[in-house]
Regions:
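Juxtamembrane boundary at the C-terminal end of a transmembrane helix
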Residues: 179-186
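Juxtamembrane helix-entry segments on the extracytoplasmic side of multipass membrane proteins
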Residues: 1-5, 66-68, 100, 130-134, ...
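Membrane helix-loop-helix hairpins that form the core translocation module of multi-pass transporters
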Residues: 32-101, 149-160, 165, 169-172, ...
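Short hydrophobic "helix-edge" motifs at membrane interfaces and signal-peptide entry regions
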Residues: 7-9, 103-107, 152
Length: 186
């Protein structure tokens, strides 16, 4: 399995309908400045997922292969269930200050991503693959695939995306990854 491609697919699917994608829509609708929003999302994701991947690499080295296999398998199954539940984002959760759109986006995204399923997936992927750069780049590309169209197309696109169907596909992917980890160790 290619760590980069698995990371792209897992995070892109998990991000559909996620609170950070909803945050992208809110920021785009409120500020109507796609470039600083997109750059803020990129840099925030890189930092957040790099830190998450470092934690994952450390966990991967600190625990034995059997503990990693069981932890990853059970965690991916839990993420599959978590993915089925639609996220909600209250407009009050989005930054309301009049500061720089880039800084607002960077901080809001970094904080919204803390403990989010895509951050948890990044930790797990890094623990599994021991490929820090491939996982960070893959998860960042996955976030871009899901969030850039949300910023550029705004609410009109969100109304047309079949979120329930995408959530089912994403949940299925995480369930398959979890089952594969438990059954085959990989």
């Amino acid at each position: 399995m290619n760590p980069f491609l698995i990371s792209v697919a897992a995070v892109a699917l998990a991000e559909i309908g996620d609170k950070t994608q909803l945050l992208s829509l809110l920021l785009a609708a409120r500020y109507r400045k796609p470039v600083p929003i997109i750059v803020g999302i990129l840099l925030s994701t890189l930092l957040n997922h790099a830190l998450a991947a470092l934690v994952g690499e450390w966990i991967g080295r600190a625990l034995g292969p059997d503990a990693i296999r069981w932890g990853i398998g059970i965690s991916f199954l839990a993420i599959a269930l978590w993915t089925l539940k639609p996220d909600k984002l209250d407009e009050n959760d989005a930054a309301k200050s009049h500061g720089s759109v880039f800084i607002i986006t960077f901080v809001a995204f970094f904080l919204a991503e803390m403990g989010d399923k895509t951050q948890v997936a990044t930790v797990l992927l890094a623990a599994k693959f021991h490929a820090l750069y491939a996982v960070v780049l893959g998860t960042t590309v996955g976030m871009r695939i899901a969030n850039v169209p949300a910023v550029l197309l705004g609410k009109a696109a969100a109304d047309r995306i079949p979120f329930q169907a995408v959530r089912l596909v994403a949940a299925g992917l995480f369930a398959l990854l979890g089952a594969a980890a438990l059954v085959t160790g990989g």
